[in-house]
A protein has these predicted regions:
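Residue-level recognition of alpha-helix termini/interfacial anchor residues
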Residues: 56-59, 174, 256, 304, ...
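Nucleotide-sugar donor-binding/catalytic module of glycosyltransferases
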Residues: 1-237, 246
Length: 328
């Protein structure tokens, strides 16, 4: 009997002490045997790594296939994922966040589907997990690249890496990296670019991954500081820019992809808006081509459309007047 292909599982670790034991146990207890685990500790300042090492000790049959990469300083989730990819040796690559967990048949089911269908990318449904239970999130957006790209740009398809499996040979051929230093929406941008590189996409109508939504210490949940939040918004703009340029270079920035991309760009630059005029001027010069989506984007209110229209025409005074009159 031929040996099953090796799967590399990449798990960035950052301040996940209350959750990481459950994550690690769910990965170690997979029904699939041939797994290489790469944990990338991005300089956590809690005891995540200690808990990780203690938990791994409970699985001696897996321990030889575990590698822990420790950053001497925080480098961000994008670089952590790139470091994991650089160290990967498996035929397939999967990802998990250290505060989430998976069902025991996840790897086996995804790899079997990829092998049978000769897929470069396989994605599946997932659970949003709350303290009072799970919510099933369906992800059936087909297996055609254009449809998948548009669904991801519109944020209908989740842009995460963790509900997807990738053939590593394809990743090497595609040559796409996470954008170092741009740690917001880095997974969405990466997945959009990869979907543009292959027609061999598979989908499984079943959920295995539990996306934990009650970790108040996660990076997304803790974006409260204004300066930090603005920096993250600029990182999002950078990821959107890299991905849209790539789609344009591939000749895909037309028709429904172009329309979806412009809405994606508009939503990214809208996050730059703050109370100061500098942020408004930054909005004006960021993705000006996306302004045509102002009156086609169903995700913004009529009042906000009018405000954006004033900015499009460089009428900051009228923007402030409307804000004053409407109180918002």
């Amino acid at each position: 009997m031929m040996a099953k292909p090796v799967v590399t599982y990449i798990i960035p670790v950052y301040n996940a002490e209350p959750f990481i034991e459950r994550c690690v146990r769910s990965l170690m207890e997979q029904s699939y045997a041939n797994i290489e685990y790469i944990f990338v500790d991005d300089c956590s300042f809690d005891c995540s790594t200690d808990v990780l090492r203690r938990t791994i000790d409970d699985y001696p049959e897996r321990k030889a296939n575990v590698r822990i990469i420790a950053h001497s300083a925080g480098r961000g989730s994008a670089t952590s994922r790139n470091d994991g990819l650089d160290a990967a040796k498996g035929e397939y690559v999967m990802f998990a966040d250290s505060d989430d967990y998976v069902d025991s048949d996840y790897v086996e089911t995804m790899v079997n589907h990829a092998e049978i269908g000769q897929c470069d990318i396989v994605y599946c449904d997932f659970y949003e997990t709350y303290q009072d239970g799970d919510r099933l999130i369906r992800q059936d957006y087909g297996t055609q690249p254009i449809g998948c790209i548009c669904s991801m740009l519109s944020r209908a398809m989740h842009g995460s890496t963790w509900n997807k499996t990738f053939r590593r040979k394809f990743l090497l051929h595609a040559g796409q990296r996470f954008v170092d230093g741009a740690d917001l929406f880095e997974d969405v941008g990466w997945n959009v670019r990869l979907m543009a590189c292959t027609p061999r996409i598979g989908y499984i109508s079943k959920a295995f991954y539990h996306y934990v939504k009650y970790n108040s210490g996660s990076i997304i949940a803790s974006m409260t500081d204004k300066a930090y939040s603005r920096m993250r918004c600029l990182q999002r703009v950078r990821n959107v820019d890299v991905s849209c340029r790539f789609l344009d270079e591939r000749g895909l920035m037309r028709g429904e992809v172009r329309r979806a991309a412009h809405i994606w760009m508009l939503m990214a630059k809208n996050d730059l808006i703050a109370a100061d005029d500098y942020s408004l001027k930054r909005w004006m010069v960021t993705f000006p081509e996306a302004d045509e989506a102002i009156w086609h984007c169903g995700q913004i209110t009529l009042n906000f459309r009018l405000l954006l229209t004033w900015l499009h025409y460089r009428c900051i005074g009228l923007y402030h007047l409307q804000k004053l009159l409407t109180g918002r």
